[in-house]
């Protein structure tokens, strides 16, 4: 009888568990440190700043009510993305909407079946730290209706091997059905032993502020195959059990263990995952507790389990191919060469403008694509000699029937203003070192001096012979045959359709597509592959520092009237110093496209380069121009890369002024000068130099030239006499400069980056984090202003072609700093096609 009575009492015991009713879906085996996705909107808001593009996810959590000890079941939708970055701080935003359907009879207090709306925000603080705030709002009736709670999140990615995540849950505690909600503190540490997502190990814990209940967990993730991850997790959870019976209520603390196994698969932009969770309950029996299912669409997913289909890439060359744009193009072409899914590349020419070395660099990268056994096709509507130079690297060249090919040769223009100055009574007075430094001749002479003319002719011969031999070889012509073809140009598409020496076909775009597919032997989609998440958080960093335009004192700026950039010495020096002092940057590439300019600014840049040499690799990649002060800046680099058509050298200096006294006299203006000091007005533009002053000026130029020569000698491992012999203002093409030891190797930016990889002991295919300097300084107000401004259709006087060309004929560094000693190319080089 006693036994039966005891059994009867046991049968009416109602067991419940005191759990925090504000939790969302359980989402087992989802980390709060390391890699983050849209689920971070509810799990650790700080992780949103580490996302790469938008993502949308749907999750469903199922549990067996018979064995459930907590909430966390239901359906959830999550959306998140990172924003900004670059000139603006990187942030992350996330949304979550969860329909919670917990085992109500198992929980105390009864949470009902609420909807939980989450809005989260994260701010990146530097590259390795992020802070987040999550806002939760409950609705749909029940004890949680209208409740608002907040979470604080922290995420740290120290490096490729270690990450940390932390949460403060329910910052603003409230009562739910008379039961206070306690704050909870979560911490998780994650280790990647191999530095990649091949293997992840993590451990974490959670403690309640009021009851002191402690949960602990561990997690392992292994990349079984590309696009397939196996996940395992074990968790020990503290439970507060409440037993209600006719004899009254009792409560006590107990524990349970949960084990989760999961499989995550990337199918490209779509990902799916499934997890199953087993439980060893407080009664020490084992049960299958439940399962979780996840589907998501991501802009930057992991590489797919199913290989990306073969495709064709389309590369458009249009607009101004300035240095930063060129970086994107050549890096992309190198990536295409290494991508096994690319079957071919179609290069579309649409009015691109760039110097010959720029075009030569792009052409070299197209040849690298061909060397990787991929077809290259060129298509143009109305091509120029510049376009054709690049297009000649292609396997097939196609021309639109409505267009033509303006193949007429190469021309350059130099301006000489002496006649105009004589007419108005202006006397240019300049001193220079040495005899090839012909920059002042545009002011002092009516035409080139014989030595300058010879130098110009030799330079043009070098450039033209390179164009001629390169294109002739590509089109299986002799240079003489190609010269005759050029001399008979330009050509219409109709003329070229009858003669396939220059093009392989004249066809409309749809017909060209058919021809390309025939050449490839199949039909392939055109377009770049989707972005893929990297297998590591950090990549070796290399700083790319641009010296773009005339070198001037102070900060970098631009002259929009003539469309010229000025490389401020102070800006470049600060960039080099910042890159040198940044411990995360392994090497520096100085990317130069400059004719020189201010002697002082050029030397300050060179000094900073020498200060960096030996601290970390510092390499130079010359683009179209790296002459005079531009060469001074490069002299201290460990290795100098240039294209054969780069224009460099011009090791020399000049200084002077314009005597306006004749003009002033013609205008009937009288000038009275007061001075204390014999040479107080020596730089005045209202009188000429005395003979004594010109001698003193030349002595100062000799001193500066000596410093220039000494720097080149030190940097290039040459004697000063050897540098002087190839200096004295002489301008060279890269092809001429290499035998003179002014250039080490032919190549472009990618070749310099390969050298950086070598010096950092990295594989040649290692992905790099390119840090571009100087940072583009645009204020938020300026960005908003550009978005809201409507351009007015007006053409200022300075935009008239004739006026613009005349103004461009004057070196920009002289326009800005007429009173500074100049280390600059002898002319404004404009090479027509």
Give residue spans per PLM region.
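Detector for outer-membrane/organellar transmembrane beta-barrel domains
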Residues: 146-240
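N-terminal, post-signal peptide beta-strand-biased segments of exported outer-membrane/organellar beta-barrel
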Residues: 8-90, 172
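Residues on the lipid-exposed face of transmembrane beta-strands in outer-membrane beta-barrel proteins
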Residues: 44, 58, 75-83, 119-123, ...
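Intrinsically disordered, low-complexity segments enriched in small/flexible residues
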Residues: 244-261, 266-339, 344, 411-494, ...
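Transmembrane beta-strands of outer-membrane beta-barrel pores
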Residues: 60-66, 97-103, 135-141, 168-175, ...
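Residues that define the transmembrane beta-barrel architecture of outer-membrane proteins
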Residues: 39-41, 69-75, 111-117, 146-150, ...
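Repeated loop/turn-to-beta-strand initiation elements of outer-membrane beta-barrel proteins
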Residues: 54-58, 84-95, 126-133, 160-166, ...
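Cleft-lining beta-strand/loop regions that shape enzyme active-site pockets
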Residues: 300-415, 538-663
């Amino acid at each position: 009888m006693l036994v039966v009575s005891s059994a009867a009492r046991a049968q009416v015991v109602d067991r419940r568990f005191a759990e925090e009713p504000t939790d969302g879906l359980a989402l087992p085996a989802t980390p709060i440190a390391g890699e983050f996705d849209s689920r971070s909107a509810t799990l650790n808001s700080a992780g949103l700043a580490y996302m790469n593009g938008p993502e949308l996810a749907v999750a469903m959590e199922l549990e067996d009510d018979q064995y459930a000890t907590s909430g966390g079941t239901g359906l959830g939708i999550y959306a998140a993305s990172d924003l900004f970055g670059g000139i603006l701080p990187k942030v992350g935003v996330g949304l979550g909407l969860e329909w919670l359907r917990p085992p109500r009879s198992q929980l105390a207090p009864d949470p009902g079946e609420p909807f939980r709306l989450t809005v989260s925000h994260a701010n990146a603080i530097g590259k390795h730290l992020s802070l987040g705030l999550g806002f939760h709002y409950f609705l749909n009736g029940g004890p949680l209706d209208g409740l608002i709670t907040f979470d604080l999140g922290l995420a740290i990615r120290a490096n490729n091997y270690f990450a940390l995540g932390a949460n403060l849950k329910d910052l603003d505690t409230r009562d739910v059905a008379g039961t206070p909600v306690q704050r909870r503190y979560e911490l998780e540490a994650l280790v990647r032993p191999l530095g990649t997502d091949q293997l992840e190990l993590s451990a974490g814990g959670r403690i309640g502020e009021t009851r002191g209940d402690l949960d602990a967990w561990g997690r392992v993730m292994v990349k079984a195959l590309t696009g397939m991850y196996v996940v395992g997790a074990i968790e020990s959870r503290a439970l507060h059990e409440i037993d209600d019976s006719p004899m009254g209520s009792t409560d006590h603390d107990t524990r349970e263990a949960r084990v989760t196994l999961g499989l995550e698969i990337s199918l490209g932009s779509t990902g799916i995952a499934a997890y199953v969770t087993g439980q060893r309950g407080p009664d020490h029996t084992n049960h299958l507790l439940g399962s979780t299912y996840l589907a998501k669409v991501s802009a930057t997913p992991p590489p797919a389990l199913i290989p990306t289909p073969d495709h064709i890439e389309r590369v458009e060359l249009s607009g101004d191919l300035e240095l930063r744009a060129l970086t994107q193009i050549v890096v992309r072409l190198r990536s295409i060469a290494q991508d096994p899914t690319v079957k071919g590349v179609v290069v579309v020419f649409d009015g691109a403008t760039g110097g010959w070395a720029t075009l030569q660099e792009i052409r070299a990268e197209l040849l690298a694509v061909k060397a990787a056994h991929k077809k290259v096709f060129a298509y143009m509507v109305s091509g120029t000699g510049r376009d054709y130079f690049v297009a000649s690297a292609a396997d097939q060249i196609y021309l639109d029937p409505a267009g033509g090919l303006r193949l007429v040769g190469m021309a350059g223009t130099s301006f000489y203003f002496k006649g105009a100055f004589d007419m108005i009574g202006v006397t240019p007075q300049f001193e220079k070192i040495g005899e090839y430094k012909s920059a002042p001749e545009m002011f002092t002479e009516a035409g080139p001096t014989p030595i300058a003319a010879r130098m110009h002719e030799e330079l043009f011969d070098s450039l033209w012979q390179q164009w001629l031999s390169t294109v002739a070889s590509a089109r299986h012509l002799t240079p003489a045959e190609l010269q005759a073809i050029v001399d008979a140009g330009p050509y219409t598409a109709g003329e070229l359709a009858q003669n396939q020496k220059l093009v392989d076909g004249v066809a409309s775009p749809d017909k060209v597509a058919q021809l390309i597919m025939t050449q490839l032997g199949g039909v392939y989609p055109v377009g770049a592959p989707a972005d893929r998440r990297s297998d590591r958080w950090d990549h070796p960093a290399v700083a790319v520092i641009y010296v773009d335009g005339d070198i001037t004192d102070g900060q970098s700026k631009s002259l929009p009237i003539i469309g010229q950039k000025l490389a401020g010495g102070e800006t470049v020096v600060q960039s080099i110093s910042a890159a040198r002092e940044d411990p995360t940057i392994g090497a520096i590439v100085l990317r130069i496209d400059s004719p020189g300019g201010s002697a002082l600014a050029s030397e300050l840049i060179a000094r900073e380069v020498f200060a960096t040499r030996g601290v970390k690799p510092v390499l130079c990649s010359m683009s179209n121009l790296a002459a005079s002060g531009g060469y001074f800046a490069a002299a201290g680099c460990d290795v100098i890369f240039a294209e054969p058509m780069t224009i460099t050298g011009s090791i020399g200096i000049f200084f002077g002024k314009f005597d306006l006294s004749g003009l002033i006299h013609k205008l009937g203006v009288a000038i009275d000068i007061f001075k204390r000091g014999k040479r107080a007005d020596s730089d005045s533009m209202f009188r000429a130099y005395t003979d004594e002053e010109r001698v003193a000026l030349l002595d100062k130029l000799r001193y500066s030239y000596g410093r220039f020569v000494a720097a080149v000698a030190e940097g290039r491992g040459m004697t000063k006499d050897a540098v002087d012999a190839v200096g004295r203002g002489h301008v060279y093409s890269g092809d001429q400069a290499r035998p003179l030891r002014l250039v080490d190797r032919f190549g472009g930016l990618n070749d310099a980056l390969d050298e950086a990889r070598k010096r950092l002991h990295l594989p040649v295919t290692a992905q790099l984090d390119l840090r571009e300097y100087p940072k583009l300084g645009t204020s938020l107000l300026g960005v908003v202003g550009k978005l809201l401004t409507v351009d007015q259709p007006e053409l200022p006087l300075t935009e008239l072609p004739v006026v613009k060309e005349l103004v461009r004929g004057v070196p920009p560094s002289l326009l800005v700093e007429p009173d500074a000693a100049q280390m600059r190319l002898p002319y404004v080089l404009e090479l027509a096609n």
